[in-house]
UniProtKB/Swiss-Prot annotation:
<dbReference type="GO" id="GO:0006865">
    <property type="term" value="P:amino acid transport"/>
</dbReference>
<keyword id="KW-0029">Amino-acid transport</keyword>
<feature type="signal peptide">
    <location>
        <begin position="1"/>
        <end position="22"/>
    </location>
</feature>
<dbReference type="InterPro" id="IPR004872">
    <property type="entry name" value="Lipoprotein_NlpA"/>
</dbReference>
<dbReference type="GO" id="GO:0005886">
    <property type="term" value="C:plasma membrane"/>
</dbReference>
<keyword id="KW-0472">Membrane</keyword>
<keyword id="KW-0564">Palmitate</keyword>
<comment type="similarity">
    <text>Belongs to the NlpA lipoprotein family.</text>
</comment>
<feature type="lipid moiety-binding region" description="N-palmitoyl cysteine">
    <location>
        <position position="23"/>
    </location>
</feature>
<comment type="function">
    <text>This protein is a component of a D-methionine permease, a binding protein-dependent, ATP-driven transport system.</text>
</comment>
<keyword id="KW-0449">Lipoprotein</keyword>
<keyword id="KW-1003">Cell membrane</keyword>
<dbReference type="Pfam" id="PF03180">
    <property type="entry name" value="Lipoprotein_9"/>
</dbReference>
<keyword id="KW-0813">Transport</keyword>
<keyword id="KW-0732">Signal</keyword>
<protein>
    <recommendedName>
        <fullName>D-methionine-binding lipoprotein MetQ</fullName>
    </recommendedName>
</protein>
<feature type="lipid moiety-binding region" description="S-diacylglycerol cysteine">
    <location>
        <position position="23"/>
    </location>
</feature>
Length: 271
């Protein structure tokens, strides 16, 4: 029995060693990378980057899809993925501040303008007093939306709010609009809500129901927006070869052409 136990223990130890060795190889493999993206239009763009990465750089890109803005950074921080491509710098900065993530940008992708959409009105002149306006509830995209509402004259924010105003910073509201904060994935569905007259939606989610800023937006964020999307990884992974190869693949003409096709001209090159 003692002999058998030693044999099984040795076999178990060998299997464990091989498993650990395999994990180490996967983590350091310069020709493989796991990248988190948001399901939908951005996923389609990333799939082109995936193809370019394989053909030009011999890099196998495994895309991991998410349905919200919170989980991709959580997964990256835990080491479940090697990089993600979905967020702009103000959002990344806020996540780092709030959650203590050790994440860093390694490349820029595109600006995807936010816009105001509606199934109830065709112009802001038709927006009635007391109407409900839906906006994303995460701090950076909420601020981005409020700044856009101010730019088109619907509200006025107090001076000095920078990029992160909240509803409490509204000092003038001529139409007595009711700002309704929702999770970003819920915003497209809010357009069918009888109570919601207008919704400010990120291009990523608007495209999931066939909407584009240039064609369907009642008002659209300027193309000189500071909210360029980023490729992000962990600080201890920023110099990895697989990350560098993926950035090169993403910042290619093929991906730029695909983004413009997917977003009907709504993607602006950020690099």
């Amino acid at each position: 029995m003692a002999f058998k136990f030693k044999t099984f223990a040795a076999v178990g130890a060998l299997i464990g060693s091989l498993a650990l060795a395999g994990c180490g190889q996967d983590e350091k493999d310069p020709n493989h990378i796991k990248v988190g993206v948001i399901v939908g239009a951005e996923q389609q763009v990333a799939e082109v980057a995936q193809k370019v990465a394989k053909e030009k750089y011999g890099l196998d890109v495994e895309l991991v899809t998410f349905n919200d803005y919170v989980l991709p950074n959580e997964a990256l921080s835990k080491g479940d993925i090697d990089a993600n491509a979905f967020q702009h710098k103000p959002y990344l900065d806020q996540q780092i501040k709030d959650r203590g993530y050790k994440l860093v940008s390694v490349g820029k992708t595109f600006v995807y303008p936010i816009a105001g959409y509606s199934k109830k009105i065709k112009s802001l002149d038709e927006l009635k007093d007391g109407s409900q306006v839906a906006v994303p509830n995460d701090p950076t995209n909420l601020g981005r939306s409020l700044l856009l509402l101010q730019k088109v004259g619907l509200i006025k924010l107090k001076d000095g709010v920078s990029l992160l105003p909240t509803s409490l910073d509204i000092v003038e509201n001529p139409k007595n609009l009711k700002i309704v904060e929702l999770e970003a994935p819920q915003l497209p569905r809010s357009l069918d809500d009888a109570q919601i007259a207008l919704a400010v939606i990120n291009t990523t989610y608007a495209s999931q129901i066939g909407l584009t800023p240039a064609k369907d937006g009642i008002f659209v964020e300027d193309k000189d927006s500071p909210y360029v999307n980023l490729i992000v990884t962990r600080e201890d992974n920023k110099d990895a070869e697989n990350v560098k190869k993926f950035v090169q693949a993403y910042q290619s003409d093929e991906v730029y052409e695909a983004a413009n096709k997917v977003f009907n001209g709504g993607a602006v090159k950020g690099w």
